[in-house]
């Protein structure tokens, strides 16, 4: 019975991880494509805001449409993990919301820092969600932690590159930051798809028993 339960837990963990791996890879590809097409369109003809909306919606629609079969299979596992947030304490929900929305809301007050605030928003939001799920659901999602850490590490990198290379081209600086976000999700997605999971509580440095 113990062996059967362990196998079930392991299978469930792998399914959820792969589901988020597929989702993160799709997000990564869509972000990079939309960023590049937005910059190309801006350079060639200049763009109004609604053109950006069309490009981004079309990019995500195309990528998610092409990945529909994989995402459809992954959707139940994704929704199941997201449901865990409904059981968090109110304070935890508020904190998580601030981590996600705070940096993006700050763009209105500091538009010149747009490219850094979007990286901070993705980084802090994913980090907060990772910590909350780990604390309240006793689930470790390293792929989400990777997205957070890569995004946050990209902030100083973007500052240095922008000041040294793109000081007079904020449009390119913004595109670079979005590509960093794509890289962050790609890293998390690849980790989720390639990592071999052991059962919950499994420590590979021990004899293999549950802790």
Q: Model-found features: residue ranges?
A:
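N-terminal topogenic module of multi-pass integral membrane proteins
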Residues: 1-77
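Juxtamembrane helix-loop boundaries in multi-pass membrane proteins
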Residues: 5, 9-30, 79-98, 141-151
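Alpha-helical transmembrane segments of polytopic membrane proteins
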Residues: 22-26, 51-60, 92, 115-122, ...
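Membrane-embedded alpha-helical transmembrane segments of multi-pass integral membrane proteins
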Residues: 30, 34, 59, 99-102, ...
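Membrane-helix interface and helix-disruption motif detector
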Residues: 39-55, 104-121, 161-177
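Internal transmembrane alpha-helix with an interfacial aromatic "cap," most often the third helix
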Residues: 62-87, 100-109
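Membrane-proximal helix-loop-helix units in multi-pass membrane proteins
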Residues: 86-148
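Terminal transmembrane helical module of multi-pass membrane proteins
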Residues: 132-202, 211
């Amino acid at each position: 019975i113990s062996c059967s339960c362990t196998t079930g837990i392991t299978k469930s963990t792998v399914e959820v991880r792969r589901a988020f791996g597929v989702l993160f890879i799709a997000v990564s590809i869509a972000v990079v494509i939309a960023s590049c097409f937005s910059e190309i369109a801006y350079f060639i003809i200049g763009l109004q805001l609604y053109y950006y909306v069309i490009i981004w919606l079309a990019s995500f629609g195309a990528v998610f449409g092409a990945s529909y079969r994989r995402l459809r299979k992954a959707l139940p596992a994704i929704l199941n993990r997201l449901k865990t947030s409904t059981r968090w304490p109110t304070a935890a929900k508020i904190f998580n919301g601030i981590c996600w929305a705070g940096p993006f809301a700050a763009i209105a007050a500091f538009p010149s820092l747009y490219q850094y605030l979007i990286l901070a928003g993705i980084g802090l939001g994913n980090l907060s969600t990772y910590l909350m799920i780990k604390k309240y659901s006793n689930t470790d999602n390293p792929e989400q932690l990777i997205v957070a850490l890569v995004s946050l590490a990209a902030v100083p990198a973007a500052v240095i590159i922008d000041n040294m290379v793109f000081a007079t081209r904020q449009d390119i600086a913004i595109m670079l930051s979005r590509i960093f976000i794509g890289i962050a999700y790609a890293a998390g997605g690849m980790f989720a798809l390639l990592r071999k999971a052991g059962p919950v509580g499994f420590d590979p440095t021990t004899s293999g028993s549950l802790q």
